[in-house]
């Protein structure tokens, strides 16, 4: 099975069903005749930008829209505790276990001023393309990550 077909099926499942984890997603793919290894699914989810977000009823795997929607932005905002910076980088503190999802969301914003992110358990390090852009990146994050 080609990667494109697998990606399309993953998107279809995540847009039409509530899926709480990758194991559940593997089972749903198997029901559709797609056998996939955990490592392959993990790579697919990363490539598709799948986020694991907290909802009122627990966790859910979600695919962000090409233009990040307000629903995902709202979920990300609930996970952020603080955004701080120094002369060279920006640090985002999140709820425990939520840094990866926040980092993925930032990566999918595809801001040319952001070189990349590194996520731990509850901290995201945002590395700007240039240290001269720290202020504008902070402003951008306030606008795109928080609903103030």
From Swiss-Prot:
Subcellular location(s) of the protein: Cytoplasm
The entry's keywords: Amino-acid biosynthesis, Arginine biosynthesis, Cytoplasm, DNA-binding, Repressor, Transcription, Transcription regulation
Keyword Cytoplasm: yes
SUPFAM superfamilies: C-terminal domain of arginine repressor (SSF55252), Winged helix' DNA-binding domain (SSF46785)
InterPro entries xrefs: Arg_repress, Arg_repress_C, Arg_repress_C_sf, Arg_repress_DNA-bd, WH-like_DNA-bd_sf, WH_DNA-bd_sf
Superkingdom classification of source: Bacteria
Major site of localization recorded for this protein: cytoplasm
TM region positions: none
One GO term describing the cellular component: cytoplasm
Pathway note: Amino-acid biosynthesis; L-arginine biosynthesis [regulation]
GO biological process: L-arginine biosynthetic process; protein complex oligomerization; regulation of arginine biosynthetic process
Family recorded in the similarity comment: Belongs to the ArgR family.
Name of the protein in its database record: Arginine repressor
